[in-house]
């Protein structure tokens, strides 16, 4: 079944410019709906780790993108005094008390998750936003005004602090999802975008911005890398001088590395102190 879905989605993607809500073929509609439903239940993911490496299911991402071409905007009532107008329903629109109990997570008003996102057990959603295709694994905290972008992958026991932005793949369109691995702490108002991977047990300080073009400077080695924070890194914002010394440009600085045991025993503020 999965292989058949993949074939339909890949073919539809090649012809996507021809589709609209009025003319999309039934088999394409059904295939996209099945993919979104499986994403919503967590039985299918845009990306998963295989033998230590992240594998992106590009066809699943394509299904998410196709869904926007296949649906019209509809009115979505919310209580007696508010309504919305969008293509994607909210995840919890038809939830009962039993559904919430089965899910095992908390949703604090006015947190919003879109249909097609997955929220794991013991997750706490403060007033925040989780977009379609995103996966938030068990025990994670999505703090107030944090946003988890489309198809982003959030690991177990991750803390996304207030105002954190985790980039999506839709606007602007990205090749790969942004990934935050298990046991990471992302400090307030930080932004991790453009398919950057933050590996497990890392701590990102407040106000750190990392995209694919951001230089990541390792203080211990002097090495500059891009797009990936190594496991156990403690990262703060910084600057690197230009070659002529006339100006400096923003970078992210790995100030130290910690193992999982140290990370578990040491407070976040203590780790960030130089």
From Swiss-Prot:
Q: In which pathway does it act?
A: Amino-acid biosynthesis; L-lysine biosynthesis via DAP pathway; LL-2,6-diaminopimelate from (S)-tetrahydrodipicolinate (succinylase route): step 1/3
InterPro entries the UniProt entry points to = DapD_Trfase_Hexpep_rpt_fam (IPR005664), Hexapep (IPR001451), Hexapep_transf_CS (IPR018357), THP_succinylTrfase_dom1 (IPR023180), THP_succinylTrfase_N_sf (IPR037133), Trimer_LpxA-like_sf (IPR011004)
Entry keyword Lyase? no
Q: Which GO terms describe its cellular component?
A: cytoplasm
Under the heading PROSITE patterns, the entry gives: HEXAPEP_TRANSFERASES
**EC number(s)?**
2.3.1.117
One example GO MF annotation: nucleotidyltransferase activity
Enzyme category, top tier: transferase
- Reaction(s) catalysed by this chain's protein: (S)-2,3,4,5-tetrahydrodipicolinate + succinyl-CoA + H2O = (S)-2-succinylamino-6-oxoheptanedioate + CoA
Q: Where in the cell is it found?
A: Cytoplasm
Q: Which SUPFAM superfamilies match?
A: Trimeric LpxA-like enzymes
Highest taxon above the source species: Bacteria
Q: Which UniProt keywords apply?
A: Acyltransferase, Amino-acid biosynthesis, Cytoplasm, Diaminopimelate biosynthesis, Lysine biosynthesis, Repeat, Transferase
Annotated binding of substrate, by residue: 106, 143
UniProt key word Metal-binding: no
Single GO biological process annotation from the record: lysine biosynthetic process via diaminopimelate
- What protein family is recorded? Belongs to the transferase hexapeptide repeat family.
Report the PANTHER family cross-referenced here: 2,3,4,5-TETRAHYDROPYRIDINE-2,6-DICARBOXYLATE N-SUCCINYLTRANSFERASE (PTHR19136:SF52), MOLYBDENUM COFACTOR GUANYLYLTRANSFERASE (PTHR19136)
Subunit structure as annotated in this protein's UniProt entry:
Homotrimer.
This one is known as 2,3,4,5-tetrahydropyridine-2,6-dicarboxylate N-succinyltransferase
User: Gene name?
Assistant: dapD
């Amino acid at each position: 079944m999965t292989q058949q879905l993949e074939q339909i989605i890949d073919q539809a993607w090649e012809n996507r410019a021809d589709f609209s809500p009025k003319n999309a073929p039934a088999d394409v509609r059904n295939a996209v709906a099945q993919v979104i439903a499986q994403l919503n239940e967590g039985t299918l993911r845009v990306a998963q780790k295989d033998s230590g490496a992240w594998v992106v299911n590009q066809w699943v991402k394509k299904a998410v993108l196709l869904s926007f071409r296949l649906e019209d905007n509809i009115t979505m009532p919310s209580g007696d005094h508010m309504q919305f107008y969008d293509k994607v329903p909210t995840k919890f629109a038809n939830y009962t008390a039993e559904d919430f109990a089965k899910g095992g997570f908390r949703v604090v008003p006015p947190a919003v998750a879109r249909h097609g996102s997955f929220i794991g057990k013991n997750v706490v959603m403060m007033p925040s936003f989780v977009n379609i295709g995103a996966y938030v694994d068990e025990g994670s905290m999505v703090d107030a005004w944090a946003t988890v972008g489309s198809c982003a992958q959030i690991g177990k026991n991750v803390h996304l602090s207030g105002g954190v932005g985790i980039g999506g793949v839709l606007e602007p369109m990205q090749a790969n999802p942004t990934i935050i691995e298990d046991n990471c702490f992302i400090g307030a108002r930080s932004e991790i975008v453009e398919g950057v991977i933050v590996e497990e047990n890392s701590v990102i300080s407040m106000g750190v911005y990392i995209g694919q073009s951001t230089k990541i400077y390792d203080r211990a080695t002097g090495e500059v890398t891009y797009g990936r924070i190594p496991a156990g890194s403690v990262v703060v914002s910084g600057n690197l001088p230009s070659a002529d010394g006339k100006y400096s440009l923003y970078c992210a600085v790995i100030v130290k590395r910690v193992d999982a045991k140290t990370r578990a025993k040491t407070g976040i503020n203590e780790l960030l102190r130089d």
